[in-house]
Amino acid sequence: MDSKKIARINELAKKKKTEGLTPEEAVEQAKLREEYIAGYRRAVRHHIEGIKIVDEEGNDVTPEKLRQVQREKGLHGRSLDDPES
């Protein structure tokens, strides 16, 4: 999300606190917030999918659900062809 949209979200939030929003502004605010949240969720999901967890001995202890996602995306050398990866 670009900085202009974030500035608009903040502007609408400030206006809502001080004088209230028109129905059109409330709809705009809801759409902008939803877009912001969707982008944030994508970024967090992408970050988590890139994590590989290892214990003190160097063994891969990444949860199986995350390993499956990584296999599907070919991350960390994991492959759908190799269920042990």
From Swiss-Prot:
Source species, domain of life: Bacteria
UniProt KW keywords: Cytoplasm
Compartments where found: Cytoplasm
Keyword tRNA processing: no
Record region (Disordered): 62-85
SUPFAM superfamilies: YnzC-like
Keyword Transcription regulation recorded: no
InterPro entries per UniProt: DUF896
Family that this chain belongs to: Belongs to the UPF0291 family.
NCBIfam families: PRK02539.1
Name listed for the protein in its UniProt record: UPF0291 protein stu0508
